[in-house]
Amino acid sequence: MQTYQSGLARIEINNLSMRGYIGVLEDEMMYKQDLRISIALMYDAAQAISNNDVDVAVDYQRVVDALMPLVENERFALLERLAQDLLDRVMAFTTVRHARIKVERLLALRFTESVAVTLTGRRPCSPLCV
């Protein structure tokens, strides 16, 4: 018999490789830059777990599908702005309680693998949540 509360799930989408327009220099805005995006999100998966029901789970393919057009088609001067817009899209999934987005721009500086910005978002907790 289960004697603990379960159901808070953490989904991690690690090192999603994408190309997007990022930067302030003219050549940076003419050519897409290599980006690596990692997402961690938490949601209450108790119903999905107990019913083994994919329809009430967070579909991580839908999460990625929501992010791709933003990265591939929009232009950003700052990694911070791109990260915020990505976070907004993840938090648009109403069952997501908490999310962390890490956006890395590969080879942005000499002698580095990448430069990264990480942002987090959290929904306010209702009086009933633990």
Residue ranges and their predicted role:
Residues 1-130:
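N-terminal, polar/charged subdomain of small-to-medium soluble alpha/beta proteins
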